[in-house]
Design a protein with these regions (language model features):
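Sec/Tat signal peptide C-region and signal peptidase I cleavage site
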Residues: 17-23
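Bacterial N-terminal signal peptides that target proteins for export
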Residues: 1-9
Length: 325
């Protein structure tokens, strides 16, 4: 009897082993923003749609708020394959793709519609192609929105109002040069360290889009918000290119289709919620200044454009300007 049972058991085991295991890919998606930010909203939409449309063959695990490292570490992780998908400010990619710095130049995009037209069109896709040689596939350009200045000294009406301020800046050369030109003292700090730096007075001021001010609660340690809108801040959603190519053609299409939808929805929410967030900041005691001399700022920062052109040539800047007309 034991021999019979063993034979039956072996036959059953062989039969089960002949059935292929359900193929499942698990993707790690990382970003640096808090869970209250629209980057998390976008990531959640991406996760839900990918898992539903793939029939469960692709799972997405989200790691917000820098859980897998700061922006530089996340980008390195995505290139090496430790992280599958990362969302980060486009400025964080300019070391790898200097041309992307053209999109970061102050006052490059007078409107969101123009920014979307350029980023989603031939010019943006030309830059997107440059991500592939560094191991990344660009899935889309979500947004942080227009950058504005907060500080504790007073409203910023003209470039002169920034003179002497200890100004936190990101790693964008254009923004570093801009604030140095107008007399501020730019200091690079990771965004994760910024709240404490503002609270303790290590820096006096910073610039971020409204959504980031709200998400990171900078209004708790900053009194004044001036709507300078001095630079449009795009994000880049990237995927390890080998991981993407390792999926089936159908799965790759699901990834790219859903990413495009997620970017569009995130942009729509970003615009729709901006005034609501400004009102929220005012209600919490922040003084909001809308009286900004944009023309004076544009004149003051012209050398930033010239510096970029000296280093990278004028073809991309000229193409953007021509497409803007």
């Amino acid at each position: 009897m034991n021999t019979v049972m063993k034979t039956i058991g072996l036959a059953a085991a062989l039969t089960l082993s002949a059935i292929p295991a359900f193929a499942e890919s698990v993707l790690k998606l990382a970003h640096a923003a808090p869970e209250t930010d629209l980057q998390q909203t976008m990531s959640t939409y991406f996760k839900e749609q990918i898992e539903a449309r793939s029939g469960g063959s692709i799972k997405v695990n989200i790691f917000p708020h820098g859980q897998l490292g700061n922006d530089a570490q996340m980008i390195d992780g995505a290139r090496s394959g430790i992280i599958d998908i990362a969302i980060s400010g486009l400025n964080n990619f300019t070391g790898l793709i200097p041309e992307a710095g053209a999109f970061e130049l102050p006052f490059m995009f007078p409107s969101r519609d123009l920014a979307y037209k350029i980023l989603d069109g031939e010019i943006g896709q030309g830059v997107a192609a440059k991500f592939e040689p560094v191991g990344l596939k660009l899935l889309g350009f979500p947004e942080n929105g227009y950058r504005n200045i907060t500080n504790n000294r007073g409203p910023v009406h003209t470039p002169e109002d920034l003179s002497g301020l200890q100004m936190r800046v990101n790693n964008s050369k254009a923004l570093n040069d801009m604030f140095a030109l107008v007399g501020a003292n730019p200091q690079q700090l990771p965004v994760a360290e910024l709240y404490t730096a503002l609270e303790t007075g290590v820096v006096d001021a910073q610039d971020h889009p409204i959504g980031i001010v709200v998400s990171f609660k900078f209004n708790e340690v900053q009194k004044y918000l001036s709507l300078t809108q001095h630079a449009y801040s795009a994000l880049a959603m990237v995927m390890n290119i080998d991981k993407l190519k390792g999926l089936s053609d159908a799965e790759q299409k699901i990834i790219t289709d859903v990413a495009a939808e997620a970017v569009a929805k995130q942009r729509e929410l970003s615009l729709a919620k901006e005034e609501e967030m400004i009102t929220e900041l005012e209600s919490q005691g922040m003084t909001v200044n809308r009286d900004v001399d944009a023309a004076a700022f544009q004149t003051a920062v012209k050398p930033v454009w010239e510096g970029f052109i000296d280093e990278n040539g004028d073809s991309l800047v000229n193409a953007i300007v021509a497409a803007s007309k």
